[in-house]
Regions:
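Acidic, divalent-metal-binding catalytic cores of TOPRIM
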Residues: 67-275
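Switch/communication elements of ASCE P-loop NTPase nucleotide-binding domains
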Residues: 1-104, 271
Length: 275
């Protein structure tokens, strides 16, 4: 099949309409990327429609070309398109989106609900905490998306909002106690860091509804008793969670975002999901 489309591309025909269902079927990841590239080039002079369950075929460089189909008991089947200006204003921003949204992060488009987190420690910790609460997030269709730092959380929240994807955001507050710092140079550095984090925190508070915004104070390391200077935070997070006896033993900072996203997608803890 790929050879047919490649040949069509090579002979430079224009004005065709292609409709392809599940182009990822029977293709390993490398071939999926290759096929996606061919279809993207074909779309320059033709119309290409694909339906997919593969994150590989989602190209956020042109977000206006992505249509998200969702189905639930309340609304039935709905289709959601976004305006380009809702997400990107410049070519530079479009290229950033293409870079940020890899296959793992593109999972959000297939999720019933999403928890946006800063880094790898949280990405590991929330599913583990869910299991301690007898909540298998995969079974409920919930994805934990690591955004590569606090500075990127707002971008992901804007994309989710534009496409109507239910989400919550979990971020470190990262505000240091200046009164506890005696060294003048260290205090000056901490003041600058506080100002930077305050700016990012304010931007998140201004965009994300309060009921969807959760803060680790001052950060996840403090909440979970992790050494900030270690290079093995995930192991320490695992040991912290492994020692917990059940849902009542999980810190509120971990528990509340999980419960909030479940409420947003209409799931009660006692409900059995449709497998």
């Amino acid at each position: 099949v790929i050879a047919i489309f490649r040949t069509y591309e090579e002979i430079k025909k224009e004005g065709a309409i292609f409709a392809i269902e599940e182009p990822e079927v029977y293709l390993h990841p490398q071939k999926q990327r290759y096929f996606s590239t061919i279809l993207s080039r074909l779309s320059g002079q033709n119309q290409v429609f694909i339906t997919t369950h593969s994150p590989t075929f989602i190209r956020l460089y042109e977000p206006e070309n992505v249509c998200l189909i969702r189905r639930n008991n309340a609304d039935g089947t709905t289709a959601k398109l976004c305006e380009r200006e809702q997400i990107v204003k410049t070519e530079k921003e479009a290229l950033k989106l293409e870079n940020y949204f890899d296959n793992q992060r593109n999972e959000m488009f297939f999720a019933k609900g999403v928890i946006f987190v800063e880094g790898a420690t949280e990405k590991f910790a929330f599913p583990y905490a869910g299991r301690k609460m007898d909540v298998d997030i995969d079974r409920y269709g919930i994805s934990v998306v690591e955004c590569g730092g606090k500075g990127n959380l707002l971008t992901f929240a804007k994309v989710a909002t534009a496409f109507g994807i239910p989400y919550v955001v979990v971020a470190d507050e990262d505000i240091k106690d200046l009164a506890a710092i005696k060294d003048p140079e260290k205090k000056k550095k901490a003041e600058a860091e506080n100002a930077n984090h305050t700016k990012k925190n304010t931007a998140l508070k201004d965009f994300v509804p309060a009921a969807q915004m959760f803060w680790m104070i001052p950060n996840i390391e403090a909440v979970m008793g992790i050494n900030e200077n270690t290079d093995n935070k995930i192991k320490q997070a695992m040991e912290y969670l492994k020692a917990k006896k059940g849902k009542d033993d999980i810190a509120a900072e971990m528990k509340n975002p999980l419960l909030a996203i479940m409420r947003m997608i209409g799931i009660n803890k006692e409900d059995k999901p449709n497998d």
